A protein has these predicted regions:
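C-terminal catalytic domain of Rieske-type non-heme iron oxygenases
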Residues: 1-123
């Protein structure tokens, strides 16, 4: 995950009142963007997610490019299409790369289950 062009920022712990698997599902689900992150990462008037593929390989589970129209994907206040690539490395460890006109953003999530209904997230 090392890239000299990235600025590394460690975040967490974040305590979730949800199972670790539910928290991971939310991290991987781009279809919620228009409803939960409306105005920034999604727009209810355009909830369409174009088809993409999911493959299993030696790295884990990976998606092809997921193209999404976002109202303000990088804080510059301009609507544009962005591209996400997701990887699931282990059952509770995943990452995505988001490519915008302003550059590239990478996020890594590792979840620690505390109980059936609580977990801790690290980014």
């Amino acid at each position: 995950f090392y890239n000299e062009q990235y600025r590394n920022i460690l975040c967490g712990p974040y305590y979730y009142k949800a199972s670790a698997y539910r928290a991971m599902e939310n991290f991987l689900d781009v279809s919620h963007f228009p409803y939960v992150h409306e105005g920034l990462l999604g727009d209810r008037s355009y909830p369409v997610i174009k088809p993409y593929t999911v493959t299993i390989n030696s790295k884990g589970i990976e998606t092809s490019a997921i193209e999404i129209l976002q109202p303000d994907p990088d804080g510059l206040g301009k609507e544009s299409y962005v591209t996400y690539y997701y990887q699931v490395h282990r059952p509770l460890i995943a990452s995505f790369t988001k490519i915008t006109a302003a550059g590239e953003f990478f996020m890594f999530l590792a979840l620690t289950p505390l109980s059936d209904v609580e977990c801790i997230g690290w980014m």
